[in-house]
Amino acid sequence: MENPKPGRLCRSPGISAYCDGKENTPMKLVYLDNAATTPCCPQALAAVNKALDGPCGNPSSHYSVGYEAKQLVDTGRAQVAKALNADPGEIFFTGCGSEADNWAVKGTAFKLAAQGKKHLITSAFEHHAILHSMAMLERIGFEVSYIKPDSEGYIHPEDVEAAIRPDTALISIMMANNEIGTIQPIKELAAVAHAHKIWFHTDAVQAVGAIPVDVKELGVDMLSLSGHKFNAPKGIGAMYIRKGISPWNFLDGGGQESRRRAGTENVAGIAAIGAALEAATQNLPARMEHEQKLRDYVIDRVLKNIPQARLNGGRDKRLPGNANISFPGLEGETILLDLDMHGICASTGSACNSDSLDPSHVLLSIGLPEEIGHGSMRFTFGPQNTMQEAEYLCDTLEEIIPRRRAMSCMWLQSEGKARVFSLKGEKQ
C-alpha cells in the first residue's frame, strides 16, 4: 500500500482515521465536538449489552422476561430522577431531546389554548427544536414573543417579564446555549413565570451531565434532556414534567410511560441513559474542572496569539467545555476542512444545522456582524480530551489561520493590503 501523505485522510481498508505519513501509522483523531455528540461511556455500553443480551421481553408484558425488561426501565428512570433530584414518576422517556422540546411546546400550547391562552415566550437563540415548534404554532394562529439576548449571550428576567401578556401560556428558555455555551438564570426566569401563573420549560440538553441540574431548586415545570450529550447512545432522551403539570400527549397509542408517551420503550437506550447520567453526575466536579482547564487554555492562547480572534459569549457563566471563537477574514467551513485534514473534529455551530452555510442565528442574535459570524468555530471538550490535544489544536490554528488569511481577499482588504483589480484586469 502506498504511504499516504501527512495529514491526508486514509481510505485504505482497516484504517479509519488519519495517517502521519510514517509507515501508514494512523494519526490520532482529536474529537472536539462534544456539544454535537459524545462517545459512549463504559457504563452505558455495559448497560446496553446487558439489555440486548438478556431476555427480549416487552416491558408491558405480564410474564417473567417482560418483568425483567421493566426492571431495566425502572432502574434507568430512577437513575435519571436521582441525578435531577426529581421523582421517578416525573421522568418520561422520549426518542431524543428534540422530541421532548416539541412535546413541551406543542403539548402546552394545545392544552391551554382552550383557556384562551395562545401566546408563548422564548428566546431568539434557542435550538431549532424550539424555534421551529414555535414557528409551526404561529402558522396556526398562536403568537410568539422572541426575547433577544444581550451581546454576551444572556437573557434577562426583566425582558421576559416585560413580554408577558394575560394570554401567555408558556415561557421556554434554554438552560445553556448549544453554540456559545452561555448559562441562563433559569431559577430567576422560572420565578418570573410562576409569579404570573405561567408554565415554564427549559431545554437543558446541553446542561444535563455538564453542570449541576436540580429541578426542585430551579423550580422548572418541564425540562428536556438528551442522552447522547452525556455519553449515552443516540436515540434516547427524556422529559421531566413536574407533578400537577399535564401538557397534551405528543404521541398517542399505547399506555406506555404512564399513558403520557406511546410506543414500546427503548429498553437498551433507557438502561444506557440512566447509567451514563449516573456516571456523569458522580464525577461532575472533577469533570467540570478538567473541561474548564482545557477550555481556558485554548481561549487564552488563541486570543493572545491569533490577531483579532474573539470569544463569542460571556466567559463567566459558561459551560465548562465550550469555546466559540471567531476568526475574522475567514470562512468557518475553510477552517473546519483544514482542521479535519489535521485529524481535528470541530464545528462551525450546531450540528443540527451544519448543512446550512447561513450565518448562525445564535451569533446574529447577540449582534455579531454576518462576516464575523461566518468565521466562527465551536470547540467543545469532554472528559476524554487531554491537555496534549488542546495544545495540538492551538498549534494547528496558529499554523492554518495566518496561512489562510494570506490568501483571503476579505482579510487582506480589512488590513489594507489587498490589491483590487477591475474586470479588465487593471490594478485600481
Report residues per predicted region:
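Polybasic, lysine-rich low-complexity intrinsically disordered segments
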Residues: 3-5, 24
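Basic polycationic patches enriched in arginine
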Residues: 8-11
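Pyridoxal 5′-phosphate
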Residues: 14-428
